[in-house]
Amino acid sequence: MCGQHGGVLYARKNMVVSDYAGGGLSLGEMGQAAYDYLLFGDIAILKVRNGWGDVVDLVPLPALYVRRRKDGDFSVLQKGPPLIYSARDVIFLRQYDPQQQVYGLPDYIGGMHSALLNTEATIFRRRYYHNGAHTGGIIYTTDPNLSDEMEEDIAKKIEESKGVGNFKMMFINIADGGEKGVQFIPIGDAGVKDEFANIKSISAQDVLTAHRFPSGLAGIIPTNGAVMASPETARDTYRKDEVIPLQRMFASAVRHDPEVPPHLHLQFEGLNSDGLPLTKPADNEIVITPGDGV
């Protein structure tokens, strides 16, 4: 996974969880639910019942293994027979997908090619240095005095030059050999053809754009004298536009299930019992509460 892609997913999850004030999910379970929702595009929350059929707890199911059945029920794949849960026992949240209404579609899907390109560029550069800081080449021999034993020794030394300890010299002595009896022909020049820095920079920015995540919160260093907004300003704006809507969606989905008792409703700081943002009175507004003697 691309470093920016994975890091932003965790940052978005942490922002959602940072305001969690309690409810039917523990702090860890809330983080699991938020992360699965962001990563896979959907999350199934199981309503745990007691012997009388009352809902007494909430548990997020692992989104990677959750499947929806034709009859509307849910199954969780595992080693052995799958676990089957009735549709009435599951609160299912999903991101909208215009092509199908079964599973959710992650909102970052448009940036996956950039995330993969970023990863492949890193892997290519790692292999380049692991191979001895070159992209490979051809050992071309034309000297008739080169014996079969010497050819085998050269091939063995070349193979041993890869990986750890790859900076080695090779001595070849061919009696009466020609000047160009042994030649190394490089296949390519990574320094010229591999635009590593540009690929990493552009693809990383594409990933942040796909997540709508501020560069100032992602650790991006400004280049060419560029100036970024302060992290506090970026965080406040992102929280208002991206984090609070997710918190409201989670809180609303649980609150509007008639079987979930109020003490299991998900509570977030800054949101009231209805999942709406708390409003502050205007500076010139006078708030009168009982007992003020007015």
Model-derived features with residue positions:
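Active-site and NAD+-binding cores of ADP-ribose-processing enzymes
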Residues: 51-104
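Short, low-complexity, polar/charged sequence segments that are solvent-exposed and flexible
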Residues: 64-66, 77, 157-161, 188-192, ...
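Noncatalytic linker/hinge segments flanking ATPase motor cores
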Residues: 38, 54-59, 85-91, 179-184, ...
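Short, surface-exposed secondary-structure junctions/capping segments
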Residues: 73-80, 102-111, 280-290
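A contiguous, surface-oriented mixed alpha/beta subdomain in the mid-to-C-terminal portion of proteins
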Residues: 98-279
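Pocket-edge structural micro-motifs
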Residues: 47, 78, 94, 141, ...
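Flexible, gly/proline-biased loop segments at the beginnings
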Residues: 1-65, 190, 227, 231-235, ...
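A generic structural signal for well-ordered coil/turn residues at beta-strand boundaries
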Residues: 41, 86-87, 92, 133-135, ...
